[in-house]
Amino acid sequence: MAKPTVFIPVFPGTNCEYDSAKAFERAGADTIVKVFKNLTAEDIRDSVDEFVKAIDKSQIIMFPGGFSAGDEPEGSAKFFATAFRNAKMTEAVEKLINERDGLALGICNGFQALIKLGLVPYGEIRQQDAQSPTLTYNTINRHISKMVYTKVVSNKSPWLAQAKLGQTYCNPASHGEGRFVAPKEWLF
């Protein structure tokens, strides 16, 4: 059986990338972990080229958590989104998803990046508008850290293929921007 390759991009302020790489490796995958260097314009250009090469070799892209660029300016995952809106990186990600049937996964800040990029829910990188689904500040206007219960209502995702329908899982949740906001037609 072929081993999938997982690309894990590292940005200033992200974390869990090495723990995630170890988890994928324990599950039988190969991993590529690359740091996005942004000290000079040349570093940025080189990083874009390195990321494109890594995406081209991968079947999965996994966006790690943390606080990319300190979640500034004005909210989380903007550094991720800006970098991946580069034309070369956008093209590489879209080929991964559309031509090679690749997968994307985001944890914490990485999930926020998937939403800000449009990969969730549209399946493509696109600009956000006023009607785009997003994650925003919690209604209590502060960080929340607690255990939450999540019920599996569909296992059509490869990430949930082994989950039992109807099963409830207790998971830790910790976030300052965890409130999902979308037009009514997106909500069920």
Locate each region found by the language model.
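N-terminal beta1-alpha1 cap of cysteine-dependent amidohydrolase-like domains
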Residues: 1-107, 111-122, 134-144, 151, ...
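Pocket-forming structural segment of enzyme catalytic cores
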Residues: 119-188
